[in-house]
């Protein structure tokens, strides 16, 4: 009797997860299966743009979620570059990483664009000047980072990542290179993160 009850409970639990995950509705498969950095863990990518108000609104919620991720899950951001005018902020993101000031300036650059409205996300010269001022670094060092070959190569990879994901906007979450969800698809920021949790749970089961 106990075995039957346990089986029923397991089936019910699976049904609840399956009911929440509706492929083609609140999540979908990526256009291409994308390689991940660590096959031993589950990868979560946020595709985002500093000029996106929805990304700005999601950022603090996402940061709290990332802090609670289990050890078998790792997170990284990839700037979306679906068109040329998004490139300056992508370059800023990678330059700040190279310069070691991402943690210091990530929220600040969002605030400059959306809260203070003192920075245009498409003005590369103004963005470079802002990073120089806020980082306290030598301007030549910042310029070299912005214009480095390695950053251009990384940006090309980011373009490929966005295309392979099949994302139609940002912010979008790519889970383990196979699935995507977003606030739009899921019906809200918290809902998107809950769906990501459910997808991660199912992927973890498949890996066993």
Model-inferred region functions:
Residues 3-84, 159, 163-164, 201-208:
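Extracytoplasmic thiol/disulfide redox context detector
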Residues 4-5, 133-208:
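C-terminal cap of thioredoxin/glutaredoxin-like
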Residues 14, 112-115, 148-152:
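A short structural micro-motif
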Residues 20-29, 119-125, 195:
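Periplasmic c-type cytochrome electron-transfer domains
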Residues 39-41, 89, 169-170:
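A structure-centric signal for secondary-structure junctions around beta-strands
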Residues 50, 57-129, 199-203:
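Structural alpha/beta surface segment adjacent to cysteine/selenocysteine redox centers
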Residues 55, 85-86, 120, 155, ...:
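Alpha-helix N-cap/helix-start motif
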């Amino acid at each position: 009797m106990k075995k039957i009850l346990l089986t029923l409970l397991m089936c019910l639990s699976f049904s609840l997860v399956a009911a929440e995950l509706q492929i083609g509705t609140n999540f979908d498969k990526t256009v291409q299966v994308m390689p991940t950095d660590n096959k031993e863990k589950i990868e979560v990518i946020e595709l985002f743009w500093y000029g996106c108000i929805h990304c700005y609104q999601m950022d603090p919620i996402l940061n709290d979620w990332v802090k609670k991720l289990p050890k078998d899950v790792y997170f990284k951001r990839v700037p979306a570059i679906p068109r040329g005018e998004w490139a300056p902020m992508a370059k800023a993101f990678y330059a700040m990483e190279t310069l070691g000031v991402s943690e210091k300036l990530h929220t600040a650059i969002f605030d400059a664009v959306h809260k203070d409205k003192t920075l245009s996300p498409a003005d590369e010269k103004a963005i470079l000047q802002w990073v120089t001022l806020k980082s306290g670094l030598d301007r030549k060092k910042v310029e070299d980072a912005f214009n480095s070959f390695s950053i251009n190569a990384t940006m090309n990879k980011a373009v490929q990542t966005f295309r392979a994901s099949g994302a139609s906007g940002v912010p979008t979450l790519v889970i383990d290179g196979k699935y995507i969800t977003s606030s739009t698809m899921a019906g809200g920021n918290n809902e998107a993160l809950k769906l990501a949790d459910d997808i991660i749970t199912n992927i973890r089961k498949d890996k066993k």
